[in-house]
A protein has these predicted regions:
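Exported/periplasmic cell-wall-interacting domains
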Residues: 42-47, 56-154
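Intrinsically disordered, low-complexity
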Residues: 1-37, 126-148, 265-266
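Short, low-complexity N-terminal intrinsically disordered segments enriched in polar/charged residues
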Residues: 129-162, 254-287, 292-295
Length: 384
């Protein structure tokens, strides 16, 4: 993370751990005019939360830029809401000596200093620019806000995967329209078409960061999206402001597709969910609780050569009526991705009250159903 203090003309490289700590500090130079950038050509450096978008290493005026520059995402969504204009704001080198406040709006530091940290300046690196800032960690008053926004983000993701009308309530429609440059209604209609066309969605977020800007906050996070038709990942940023009722609402967003490396975290979370589901399923079977047992299955589920809940119920009533279960054991479960959701395999040992027992490999396919999973197919192979 980078931070620029315009008053002191200082550039900080920060480690985003708790507490925030300064890794390196360098002199820099910013815009010739003081104040926050408002329009193209005003020679001011913008103030807010920005992110590195790329890297330029050639074709530059060496005296002005050296041979290295990192473009920022100015104007960001909140800047557009506020009517700010302009662009071409970079963090760049300087091929000659510089004095304070001599750029046309960019942030410049000596070329050797910039090159010494360039390996840390990947796309998506946060850059906080302020008239004056404290680099001694987040103020205590900000911690509750960060927790609030973590909760808001988790609920937003949950409402998205539930395809709920509540998903759209997380947005401030007028501001979002200005920020994105397209009507909110178009965004809504596109999402509703997807909701209607897919039997399920999964939205998993991780590696969440929360940053404070001038009268707005940014949550930045890795996102993994799954549906029967698509699996994608990337880095997303949501811009939040409070509405007139004091509720946090999303006013803008940015997304960079790519490998967010969230699949291992997603699979670990799903293994935990499946483990909890299997234990409840096992207990329902062991106790011969037919209604609880059937609740784990999709109405059209297939169980070996039986199709549908009625056939499954008839079979279990027959077996349990003659010889109730004594215990069911599950060992070595594995969970893998499947086009319908997840495929689960485990070693199953069954014991009945009359002394009968068997052992085999069970395979289940689970499909997302609301906040949980439903069994859509189940098969069992005895051990030879």
């Amino acid at each position: 993370m980078l931070a620029i203090d315009k008053d002191s003309q200082k550039f900080f490289l920060l480690t985003r751990k708790s507490p925030l700590s300064v890794t390196a500090e360098y002199p820099c130079t910013t815009g010739q005019a003081t104040g926050d950038k408002a329009r193209e050509g005003d020679l001011k450096t913008p103030e807010g939360v920005y992110f590195i978008e790329g890297k330029i290493e050639g074709g530059l005026d060496y005296d002005l830029y050296g041979d290295l520059a990192f473009p920022l995402n100015f104007p960001n969504p909140v800047d557009r809401i506020r009517g700010k204009t302009g662009g071409g704001i970079w963090v760049h080198g300087r091929g000659k000596a510089f004095t304070p406040r001599e750029t046309r709006g960019c942030v410049a530091l000596s070329l050797p200093d910039l090159k010494s940290i360039q390996t840390t300046l990947a796309p998506g690196t946060p850059v906080v620019i302020a008239k004056h800032l404290s680099v001694n960690g987040a103020p205590a008053r900000d911690i509750p806000i960060e927790k609030e926004l973590h909760r808001e983000l988790r609920q937003w993701a949950r409402d998205w995967e539930l395809r709920s009308e509540r998903f759209f309530g997380h947005y401030e429609q007028e501001a979002f329209t200005k920020a994105q440059g397209t009507p909110f209604e178009a965004f809504r209609q596109r999402k509703e078409r997807i909701f209607a066309s897919q039997p399920w969605l999964q939205v998993f977020v991780g590696h969440v960061g929360v940053l404070a800007g001038p009268d707005y906050w940014v949550t930045c996070f890795d996102q993994l999206y799954r549906s029967p038709a698509l699996i994608s990942s990337g880095r997303k940023r949501l811009y939040w402001q409070k509405n007139a009722d004091g509720q946090w609402r999303i006013v803008g967003r940015e997304f960079a597709p790519g490998n967010a490396d969230l699949l291992p975290d997603y699979m670990e979370a799903k293994r935990q969910e499946v483990g909890e589901l299997l234990e409840k399923w096992r207990q329902a079977w062991k106790s011969a609780d037919l209604s609880a047992y059937l609740a784990f299955y999709e109405p059209s589920a297939r169980q070996d050569n039986r199709q549908g809940l009625e056939a499954i119920a008839e079979h279990k009533e027959h077996v349990w009526g003659k010889n109730p279960p004594a215990d069911v054991f599950i060992e070595r479960p594995t969970v893998e991705l499947n086009d319908k959701g997840l495929e689960v395999r485990f070693l199953q040992t069954y014991a009945a009250q009359n002394g009968y027992s068997d052992k085999g490999v069970k395979t289940m396919v689970l499909e997302p159903r609301g906040a949980s999973w439903a069994i859509v197919s189940e098969s069992w192979e005895p051990l030879s």
